[in-house]
């Protein structure tokens, strides 16, 4: 379940996608600290300063991503030259992008200042994250995320549903319960 907790990278990615100003970013992080501490990575639950510093670091990365990405091969060469090893796969999970969707959905609904729901078609959700069909493992992961983030999927007229029962082109509406 550790991979479902909010990391600084997750928070920065969500904030970047929301295109918030500096004060709005600070307010957003303050709300997360006050209300979502149970969902924060364990290293941040008692250290607000570290959470803000690490999130700010990643926000800086996203603001100048092309330049920093251009330097990545040099960092890898330096690590190899000094006998070190950079294991990028240690920082991702099989469903990292999909996890970020559910994390973002919860935070946008609760603190985005707009709608109290997120909606999209099942086809869009699957296509956006590179899936072509609902496998049992993917469904298990969907249900795990929905349960963990206290989200409930609905179809039209606020009828509760299960994602696998929704038609591929039907709109799914997620709300925090």
Which residues does each predicted region cover?
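Short glycine-rich, basic-tinged beta-strand/loop micro-motifs
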Residues: 34, 112-133
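C-terminal edge-of-domain segments
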Residues: 158-177
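Long, low-complexity, charged/polar intrinsically disordered regions in eukaryotic proteins
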Residues: 44-97
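Short capping segments at the starts of secondary-structure elements
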Residues: 6, 15-24, 115-120
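Charge-enriched amphipathic alpha-helical scaffolds
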Residues: 36, 41-61, 126-163
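Charged, low-complexity interaction regions
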Residues: 14-27, 37-46
């Amino acid at each position: 379940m550790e991979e479902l907790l909010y990391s600084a990278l997750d928070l920065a990615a969500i904030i970047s996608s929301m295109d918030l100003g500096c004060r709005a970013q600070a307010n957003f992080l303050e709300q997360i600290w006050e209300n979502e501490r149970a969902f924060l990575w364990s290293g941040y639950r008692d250290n607000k300063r570290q959470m803000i510093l690490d999130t700010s670091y990643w926000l800086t990365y996203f603001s100048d991503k092309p330049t920093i990405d251009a330097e990545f091969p040099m960092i890898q060469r330096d690590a190899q030259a000094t006998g070190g090893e950079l294991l990028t796969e240690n920082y991702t999970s099989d469903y990292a992008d999909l996890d970020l969707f559910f994390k973002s959905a919860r935070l946008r609904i609760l603190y985005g200042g707009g709608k109290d729901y997120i909606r999209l078609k099942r086809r869009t959700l699957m296509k956006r994250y590179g899936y072509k069909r609902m496998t049992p493992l993917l469904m298990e992961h969907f249900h795990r995320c929905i349960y963990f983030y206290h989200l409930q999927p609905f179809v039209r007229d606020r009828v509760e549903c299960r994602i696998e029962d929704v038609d591929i082109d039907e709109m799914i509406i997620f709300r925090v319960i």
